[in-house]
Every structure is written in structure tokens, then in C-alpha cells.
Amino acid sequence: MPAARSLNDRLIVPVAPIVAEAGADTTYARFSLFDADVAPGSDIDMCVFNSANALVGSSGSGTSAEEVNLTNPAAGNYTVVVQGWGVDGSSPFKLHTWLLGSAAAGNMTVSAPASAVLGQTGTISLSFSGLAAGTKYLGSIAYSGATGMPSPTIVRVDTP
């Protein structure tokens, strides 16, 4: 489960492009902004473009809590454009970027039954180790054995 890569002290001027590179093994990408990481009352929005400059995702709401998710993104550079929609001049922000691959990071353990029965409930437990304090992490859980399973399940952990 990788920690978010953050860009601190960027200013919204009104548009700030940031480049993230997805590798051939990237299975999931998430780009997030959080209200707590901007000045109170700010409204910033986000667009994500692939290496061909095609829009692949956007998020714009009345706040600064924005998120774009890409499942199995093509390898290449992605440009994230953060725009100040409702800010008073320049406003610092933090962009959180996660690029998940198929390899386990070794800091999340999943305990689940070996099989499931249609129509019945089961318990799946997650435990975490070695996570740094004050960090946002993102991971995924993949399922096997049957078609139609929700794969992957995305898990975000914010450590105190």
C-alpha cells in the first residue's frame, strides 16, 4: 500500500499543471485534493489528461474535495491541472497522487475465508503494519475464482 506522493506549496495561479508517470504495471491511479489542504472556503477543481492530451477524468464540485480515478491506465505521462475556481488570489494546495501496481507492498494483510457461498455473508479483515504517521495510503484487494467479482476493492487509510 503506497503512501500518497504529495506536492506541497504549489500555488493556484489560476492553473497549475503537474505530471505523474504511470508505468506498464500500473493497475489503478488516483489523484485527490482535500478541503483540509487548502485555505478555508476555497474551491479548486481538477482535470487529468493523458500523454495524447486527451481528457481522461475531471472533478469539480463546490468545494476543494476533488478526485479522479483511473482503472488500468495506459502507461505514460498524465498531466493533472488544478484550477482555482473560487479562491482569493493565490492559494496553496496539496495534490495527492497514488499509482498502484500489481506487486504487494507488504504493509497490508487480508484475512478472508477460502471460499464464499452465494447469498451468504462472510467476514474479511484487514490489518496494516509499518505505516508512517500523518500519511494517506491507498491499496487494493483483488479477488479470484469467480466472474463478476468487484475487483479491485480500493482501500484508503489515513494514519493519525
Language-model segments: residues:
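Feature for long, exposed domains in two main contexts
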Residues: M1, A24-D25, P73, Q83-P160
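Extracellular beta-rich ligand/substrate-recognition surface
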Residues: M1-V13, V56-G62, S115
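Acidic, Ser/Thr/Pro-rich low-complexity intrinsically disordered segments
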Residues: S6-A54, L131, S140
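Exposed aromatic-hydrophobic patches
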Residues: P17-V19, A65-T71, S125-S127
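Short, solvent-exposed aromatic-acidic interface loops
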Residues: A36, S61-S64, V155-P160
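Noncatalytic accessory or regulatory domains flanking protease catalytic cores in secreted, cell-surface
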Residues: C47-H96
